[in-house]
Design a protein with these regions (language model features):
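Solvent-exposed interaction patches of small proteins and small membrane subunits
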Residues: 1-87
Length: 87
């Protein structure tokens, strides 16, 4: 992986902390809307981490593919992931 590992790990650790906080909120019977807002915030951070990884894939794996066939394969991989992201 050629992505900025420090940035990715920071984002994922932030999401992890938020999810742990959400679990505590559930145990403490916090208002549902507040819990939902925290879930949305966690999902947004995970999405940012995914975008960073996909960006690195485009900049490194696709660009540096050794053959046209390999480039097409890498592009198909990212296309399939983007379809999932957009859903």
């Amino acid at each position: 992986m050629k992505a900025d590992k420090t940035q990715i790990k920071r984002l994922l650790n932030t999401a992890k902390g938020q999810i742990e906080g959400i679990l505590r909120m559930i145990d403490e019977d916090v208002y549902c809307i507040e819990i939902s807002n925290q879930i949305l915030a966690s999902a947004a951070i995970l999405k940012r981490a995914n975008i960073e990884i996909l960006d690195a894939h485009l900049k490194h794996c696709v660009v540096n593919a050794s053959s046209q066939e390999e480039k097409e394969e890498k592009m198909l991989e990212i296309s399939n992931v983007l379809k999932k992201v957009i859903k």
